[in-house]
């Protein structure tokens, strides 16, 4: 018989740096999950993606065990890394803060493909381009 699910928790955590401090501790604590167990597993699985924010969906079962699924980093985080900037523009339609190449957009789209509801890489590229536009990043090429 399958375990009964009692909760789904969605968090965005820095790769390899999950600690029992908020937001992890309170979110898992209210469901009675072993917080240190989650932190160690998460950090072990994300150690190669250092410096990125990783969304994670944690499923908590009735016997207080858990499983989690790692998602791809948000498009905005990948775009900021590709452009080499700390944050997007406050007024994206007036102030452009950086440029990325079409090749970089394609690479990000291919990375995000598993989490996007796009049927092709071209469609995913348009989604990423829209995110870039709303951040004040121009696309060359």
Curated annotation (Swiss-Prot):
One of its GO terms (cellular component) is cytosolic large ribosomal subunit. One of its GO terms (biological process) is translation. CDD domains: Ribosomal_L11. Keywords: Methylation, Ribonucleoprotein, Ribosomal protein, RNA-binding, rRNA-binding. It holds the Pfam family Ribosomal_L11_N. One or more lysine residues are methylated. InterPro entries: Ribosomal_uL11, Ribosomal_uL11_bac-typ, Ribosomal_uL11_C, Ribosomal_uL11_C_sf, Ribosomal_uL11_CS, Ribosomal_uL11_N, Ribosomal_uL11_N_sf. GO terms for molecular function: large ribosomal subunit rRNA binding; structural constituent of ribosome. PROSITE patterns: RIBOSOMAL_L11 (PS00359). SUPFAM superfamilies: Ribosomal L11/L12e N-terminal domain, Ribosomal protein L11, C-terminal domain. Belongs to the universal ribosomal protein uL11 family. HAMAP family: Ribosomal_uL11. Part of the ribosomal stalk of the 50S ribosomal subunit. Interacts with L10 and the large rRNA to form the base of the stalk. L10 forms an elongated spine to which L12 dimers bind in a sequential fashion forming a multimeric L10(L12)X complex. Forms part of the ribosomal stalk which helps the ribosome interact with GTP-bound translation factors. This is Large ribosomal subunit protein uL11. The lineage of its organism: Bacteria, Bacillati, Bacillota, Clostridia, Eubacteriales. The gene is rplK.
């Amino acid at each position: 018989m399958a375990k009964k699910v009692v909760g789904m928790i969605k968090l965005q955590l820095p790769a390899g740096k999950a600690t029992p401090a908020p937001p992890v501790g309170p979110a898992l604590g209210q469901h009675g999950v072993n917080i240190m167990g989650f932190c160690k597993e998460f950090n072990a699985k994300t150690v190669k993606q250092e410096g990125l924010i990783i969304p994670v969906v944690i499923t908590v079962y009735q016997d207080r065990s858990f499983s989690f699924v790692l998602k791809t980093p948000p498009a905005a985080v990948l775009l900021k890394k590709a452009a080499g900037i700390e944050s997007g523009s406050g007024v994206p339609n007036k102030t452009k803060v950086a440029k990325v190449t079409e090749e970089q957009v394609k690479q990000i789209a291919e990375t995000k493909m598993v989490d996007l509801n796009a049927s092709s890489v071209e469609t995913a590229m348009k989604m990423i381009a829209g995110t870039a536009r709303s951040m004040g990043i121009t696309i060359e090429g």
